[in-house]
Amino acid sequence: FLPLLAGLAANFLPTIICKISYKC
C-alpha cells in the first residue's frame, strides 16, 4: 500500500508544482 501511495505522490507532485508555480 505504501509503495503505491509513494508512486501516486511521485505522479501527482510535478502536476501540483506545475499548477502552483505555473512553470510547465
UniProtKB/Swiss-Prot annotation:
Disulfide bond listed as a keyword: yes
Tissue: Expressed by the skin glands.
InterPro entries xref list: Antimicrobial_frog_1
Cell location: Secreted
Disulfide bonding pattern of the chain: C18-C24
One annotated Gene Ontology cellular component of this protein: extracellular region
Record key words, sorted: Amphibian defense peptide, Antibiotic, Antimicrobial, Disulfide bond, Secreted
One GO process term, biological-process aspect: defense response to bacterium
Role played: Has a non-hemolytic activity. Has a broad spectrum of activity against both Gram-positive and Gram-negative bacteria, fungi and protozoa.
Quaternary organization: Monomer.
Family, similarity comment: Belongs to the frog skin active peptide (FSAP) family. Brevinin subfamily.
Official protein name in the record: Gaegurin-6
Source species: Glandirana rugosa (Japanese wrinkled frog)
